Amino acid sequence: MTVLKNLYDVQQLLKKYGILVHLGKRKWDIELMAIELDNLYKAGLLEKKIYLNAKLVLKHEHEYEERLEREKGLD
């Protein structure tokens, strides 16, 4: 089983399916990656363990980005 540890790993997983995400803001990229993962899983292309692992990585990264925004006073 593939173990995904960071955002780069999730990007590489999506790349295997021809999905490249770059919207210009890291938080937006993470949100779109989560949507794409959902679509791949619903289509039966991802194993549940890999899907959940990737979603957990994205959740962690998204929370980190939100924390940075709060600290900088942005929203």
PLM regions: where:
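Short, charged early-sequence alpha-helical segments and their helix-coil boundaries
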Residues: 43-59
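Amphipathic alpha-helical interaction surfaces
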Residues: 16, 20, 39, 43, ...
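Short, conserved alpha-helical segments within structured domains
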Residues: 26-33, 54
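Charged low-complexity stretches with an acidic bias
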Residues: 1-6, 55-75
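Amphipathic alpha-helical segments that form the core helices of the histone-fold
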Residues: 30-42
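N-terminal acidic leader/helix
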Residues: 1-27
